[in-house]
Curated annotation (Swiss-Prot):
The gene is melA. Keywords: Cytoplasm, Iron, Melanin biosynthesis, Metal-binding, Repeat. Pfam families: Glyoxalase, Glyoxalase_5. Residues 12-141, 155-305 form the VOC domain. This is Protein MelA.
């Protein structure tokens, strides 16, 4: 039920919509991650991919909102669908709280929507679940669906936003004031040459988080590199929660997905710090998985290199730990800097 803490009745993420000038490449990425290509929209050139509770829409419309979004940004997350108890109630409540409504003639999809980060759209979806959802009502079966062996990714754990310097508080307040997100972490992260600050917000229903990143110092940091390539603020990465990250990476071995390189010295001490890790340590080293935690639990995570434009994917497995890998920030940041050096940015 909607409440003071959850004023719009938010219940989680229903879908992520992608727009891209290179449809074939995006399709291959989805397949390599274990998504099945199942359905197409009845009226639009939009294809539906699924893996467990992660739903992707790949928009190939030549005109309209997502087409223009891709022209502006390149490969992009043009919209998301967020689950709510009542879509019209959530939409009206969001607008009353200061959100900008999206007009019907602007949208590619027929659901109530507001503008979100970087003028992407947030649709409000109140039909979801196994028996009654938008994929049964608004989509139809493909003549030749592609059923892929899933890779163990069960839901979107978090999605990270990159914003211009001086606007982090604005976007933090957007999520807090309109949806009821709460701040759960603040980070000030330094690498060898660059730095950033980050707020992490949790949705009022507790189902997902949105960290917001802002660069520090000169414009060569990873956040400002993203903003330049993407032409504005937007979603930097999605994090897939895995039920077994080692098994997921074993299943993806040999695919097109490349992950960041971690210096071998990282593993000299990590298992002394976290002796409770039960996963195969040789496989952790082989896949260059990062590990972080405390006496109560730990998490395992890995990051791809930039996959589509400046956007990448994180894979995370949580074992009684709700953090973001704070203990790995220095190693991760320096790995990203090495990748920036390789690409001539630093």
């Amino acid at each position: 039920m909607a409440s003071e803490q959850n004023p719009l009745g938010l219940l989680g993420i229903e879908f992520t919509e992608f727009a891209t000038p290179d449809l074939d490449f995006m399709h291959k990425v989805f397949i390599d991650f274990g998504f099945s290509k199942l359905k197409k929209h009845k009226q639009k050139d939009i294809v539906y991919y699924k893996q467990n509770d992660i739903n992707f829409l790949l928009n190939n419309e030549k005109q309209g909102f997502s087409a223009q979004f891709a022209k502006t940004h390149g490969p992009a997350i043009s919209s998301m669908g967020w689950r709510v108890e009542d879509a019209n109630f959530a939409f009206e409540g969001a607008v009353a709280r200061g959100a900008k409504p999206a007009a019907d003639e602007v949208k590619d999809l027929p659901y109530p929507a507001i503008y979100g980060i970087g003028d992407s759209l947030i649709y409000f979806i109140d039909t979801f679940g196994d028996d009654n959802n938008i994929y049964t009502s608004d989509f139809e079966a493909l003549d030749e669906p592609i059923i892929t062996q899933e890779k163990g990714f069960i839901e979107v754990d978090h999605l990270t936003n990159n914003v211009h310097k001086g606007t982090m508080e604005y976007w933090s307040n957007f999520y807090k004031d309109i949806f009821g997100f709460t701040e759960v972490r603040y980070f000030d992260i330094k690498g060898s040459q660059t730095a950033l600050i980050s707020y992490a917000l949790r949705s009022p229903d507790g189902s997902f988080c949105i960290p917001i990143n802002e660069g520090k110092g000169d414009d060569r940091n990873q956040i400002d590199e993203y903003l330049k390539e993407y032409d504005g603020p937007g979603v930097q990465h999605l994090a897939f929660r895995s039920r077994d990250i080692v098994a997921s990476l074993d299943a993806m071995e040999g695919s097109s997905i490349q992950t960041l390189d971690i210096i071998p010295e990282y593993y000299d001490t990590i298992f002394e710090k976290l002796p409770q890790v039960t996963e195969d340590r040789d496989r952790i080293k082989h896949h260059q998985i990062l590990v972080d935690g405390d006496e109560d639990g730990y998490l395992l995570q890995i990051f791809t290199k930039n996959l589509f434009g400046p956007i990448f994917i994180e894979i995370i497995q949580r074992k009684n730990n709700l953090g973001f890998g704070e203990g790995n920030f220095k190693a991760l940041f320096e790995s990203i800097e090495r990748d920036q050096v390789r690409r001539g940015v630093l």
